[in-house]
Amino acid sequence: MEHVTVSEEPSATLMYHVERPIFSEAYIDSELLHKRKKTPKPYKLRVAEHLCCSSEKVKSVVFGFLPILTWLPSYPLKEYLFGDIVSGISTGVMQLPQGLAYAMLAAVPPVFGLYSSFYPVLLYTFFGTSKHISIGTFAVISLMIGGVAVREAPDSMFMVNGTNSSLVVNIEARDSRRVEVVVALTTLVGIIQFVLGLLRFGFLAIYLTEPLVRGFTTAAAVHVSVSQLKYLLGVKTARFNGPLSVVYSLDAVLRNIADTNIVTLIIGLGCTVFLYIIKQLNERFKKKLLIPIPGEIIVVIVSTGISYGMLMSENYGVDVVGKIPTGLLPPKVPDFSVFPNLFADAVPIAVVGFSITISLAKTFALKYGYSVDGNQELIALGLCNFVSSFFHTFVVTASMSRSLVQESTGGHTEIAGLLASLLVLLVVVAIGFVFQPLPTTVLAAIIMVNLLGMFKQTRDIPVLWRKSKIELAIWLVSFFASVLLGLDYGLAVAMAFAILTVIYRTQRPKNVVLGQIPDTGLYFDVDEYEEAEECSGIKIFQSNSSIYFANSELYVKALKAKTGIDPEKLLDAKKLQLKYAKRDTEGTKTVNQGSLLKKNAVVLLDMELGVTHEVLNGPQKPKHVHTNGQMTEKHIESESEDEFFLQRLTPIHSVILDFTPVNFIDSVGAKTIKSVIKEYATVDVKVVLAGCSRTLLSELRTLQFFSEPVTPDLIFPTIHDAVLQCKRWRDLPVHPNIH
């Protein structure tokens, strides 16, 4: 019976009172709960329903595959069109220089960055579910691609005799081969992402936890910055890939720093300072500016004009972008023969690209109150990369900087991205050749300034130090592994370490003994809360973890340590007591056998566990004490030898295992708990379980946990039920206020 009582005073606490019997799972299953009867459908009927092709199912599949059909028919022109136009132009203006710059990171000619800023963006408009992210080139992915291209097509493969009988690199042949490798890699990444999307593997992103991703992208920023130093200084060095590539690249730049082109350095530093100032102004006055100041396109146009007018390439030796063909290249089938060499690289690129996209998409979706589908995003990215690869593009993902511009300038839908791609198309078709005199140091400046946001992620370190040491460890391992081992190996190490931290958490959970708050049915950690009082003769143990093969033994060790009850040690002590008692009765003592037995009681001091177990109660006389394996004689009393050895070895008669935090248990864990129940029974301590969820109980039944000596009578829905029943078993009085 249950009723609620509310005091008439305004500040009164709402009270409730429940009167019911003590419930065990045996009673609940037999009397209280009855499962709903469900008639399983025949297998043929289930197959027929699954294969049934109704109009609603077709519509759902089509609309799910082409999300544009869900929002375009109801597109509000008056409210959204102007904002999407402004946003599209702003994003497109930003996408042009970034496409050129990130192509350098991908180790392909700049024009392929423009192709990658058009085709995938156009496709995402039809297949994507996010309204605000900007798909296209991105520094991290471009760098990973470039590493593969340089490995598969190094300069050493394209050495030819120069004019002075010296060996020089055939740039045209090298770039052509690198484009083939990058395009094939993009095709493979697209296939992987598309297949994962069809298999509903959108949940993969959860394994790339935020500290891991932020540490990884910060490390990528270090790699990118180091790779751009040679362009900023105008020195000629080889491109390094793999473990310690950052160290080798820095060493190469420093060895050749005497060859720095001063004009190149001045242009690069000037553009860097200008872009940094513009970035700060845009951030400071973003609420007052209709659109951000397009600093990147300004430096591109101005530096291109100056370079063209002053013939910087010919007169000052400044490296420039070079030939940019006008128009679009015809489609071409990728080179499938290199797939076996690229598969190991394609998997991490596919996963990282998707992780960046879905994290940005979810951020904007949460802000504006709509939902994104992770599986559809995988399909959309896969199609963007796969289809576009036939048109000479490299792998794309969402860009944080462009997405922020697209959102802040009033973008409402994917129409903004569509307009941005059309602006890129206009440049490629009509005026791409204009950017041929553009100094590469300007592109390096654009890249490095855009990395500032990633470097700011180092601010996570003090925050994580205060919040979570384990997450800080993930961040640091991800960062240093990626910096030193390279992005591919670094990501693998970081993911492995993140998984190990999950195992570590389950193996090192918080283990506590619970006590009751007086006059309530609430139980809390006795070490943390002074109001919590242990129940006489009962230990309540809670471990904040599930129980499975990796931590089952640790669970038992923690149980024995926290409760102070080790059945094996208690039984050994009992055997020692018997041995010494027999020796004393057979030896020549000043007291006879009868008087010794009358005065025997035992206190076992288990110094190893740091607790005292009273083995027998009674007036203390000469007795035996077991301390760290040594026996000493003291005085106690007892009635007879039989009574002496039948007394309890510990004042604790019951142990309650709180299973409230346990989400799952495997066969090893179930066997472990069952052995604990049997082991404690040998020293007359009853072990019961409390707080098991219905799912956990179902798992225990499946694992055949309920067989002698374990029965459902030992399982209770709450700790309070278990405490009351344990007291009843020992015929102890139950306080009336805690019924």
Curated annotation (Swiss-Prot):
Sites carrying sugar chains: N161, N164
Intramembrane parts of the chain: 245-256
Domain STAS: 528-726
Known tissue expression: Expressed in hair cells of the auditory organs.
Annotated site residue numbers, Controls the anion transport: S401
Activity control mechanisms: Sulfate/chloride antiport activity is inhibited by salicylate; this inhibition is reversible.
Further information: The anion-binding site that controls electromotility and associated charge movement in mammalian, corresponds to the central binding site of the anion transport pathway in non-mammalian.
Protein name, entry field: Prestin
Species of provenance: Danio rerio (Zebrafish)
